[in-house]
């Protein structure tokens, strides 16, 4: 997973409430186990409109998405985070998220920032013409107009994003400790080695 510390760029000013995982990635895209290409299906129903935000040149490579309340609600599908990541989104800013989506986002290198609605409204206004900057280390969202918003994040999630650690790489970090534990168990209970094989 690519580490995330600072992200700056255009933000897609979606602003819609209750965007569920079926809107983020429709069910017919869930037949794959690979992340590559999932961005093509991201927000498919919204992208049917020829004037949709996602395909406008100014937002095509945007690393930030600004959404409304309850983003990522609905069914639990990690494919939603895969689709956002494949679309190039590294940060989603919204007033609230589904707990499952929020966890899946972090596990896939996407920072879910929670800000109050007044801050969202200001960022939607700025995003129409100017970039937004997110600094995870300092937990801030800033604009070129001296707007500065702070956000909270669980320290463990913050560490995982800053270091680019998913569940596998986090476990691999403890490889030496796991090996030492297994060696100690083998010495304390040699009969277990024979049972396990």
UniProtKB/Swiss-Prot annotation:
Catalytic activity: (2R,3S)-3-isopropylmalate = (2S)-2-isopropylmalate
Annotated EC: 4.2.1.33
Swiss-Prot/TrEMBL keywords: Amino-acid biosynthesis, Branched-chain amino acid biosynthesis, Leucine biosynthesis, Lyase
InterPro entries: 3-IsopropMal_deHydase_ssu, Aconitase/3IPM_dehydase_swvl, AconitaseA/IPMdHydase_ssu_swvl, IPMI_Swivel, LeuD
Record-linked Pfam families: Aconitase_C
Stored Gene3D superfamilies: Aconitase, domain 4 (3.20.19.10)
Family of the protein in this entry: Belongs to the LeuD family. LeuD type 1 subfamily.
Alphabetized PANTHER family for the sequence: 3-ISOPROPYLMALATE DEHYDRATASE SMALL SUBUNIT, 3-ISOPROPYLMALATE DEHYDRATASE SMALL SUBUNIT 2-RELATED-RELATED
Subunit structure: Heterodimer of LeuC and LeuD.
Protein task: Catalyzes the isomerization between 2-isopropylmalate and 3-isopropylmalate, via the formation of 2-isopropylmaleate.
Name of this protein: 3-isopropylmalate dehydratase small subunit
């Amino acid at each position: 997973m690519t580490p995330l510390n600072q992200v700056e760029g255009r933000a897609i000013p979606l602003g819609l409430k209750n965007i569920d995982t079926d809107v983020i990635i429709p069910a017919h895209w869930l037949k794959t186990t690979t992340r590559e290409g999932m961005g093509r299906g991201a927000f498919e129903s919204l992208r049917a409109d020829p004037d949709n935000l996602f395909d406008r040149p100014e937002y095509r490579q945007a690393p930030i998405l600004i959404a409304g309340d309850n983003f990522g609600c609905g069914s639990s599908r990690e494919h939603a985070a895969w689709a956002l990541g494949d679309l190039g989104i590294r940060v989603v800013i919204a007033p609230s998220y589904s707990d499952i989506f929020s966890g899946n986002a972090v596990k896939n290198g996407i920072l879910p920032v929670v800000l109050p609605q007044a801050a969202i409204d200001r960022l939607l206004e700025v995003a129409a013409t100017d970039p937004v900057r997110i600094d995870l280390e300092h937990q801030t969202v800033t604009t070129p107009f001296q707007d500065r918003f702070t956000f909270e994040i669980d320290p463990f999630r913050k560490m995982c994003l800053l270091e680019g650690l998913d569940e596998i790489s986090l476990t691999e970090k403890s490889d030496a400790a796991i090996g030492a534990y297994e060696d100690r168990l083998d010495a304390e209970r040699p009969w277990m080695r024979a049972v396990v094989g």
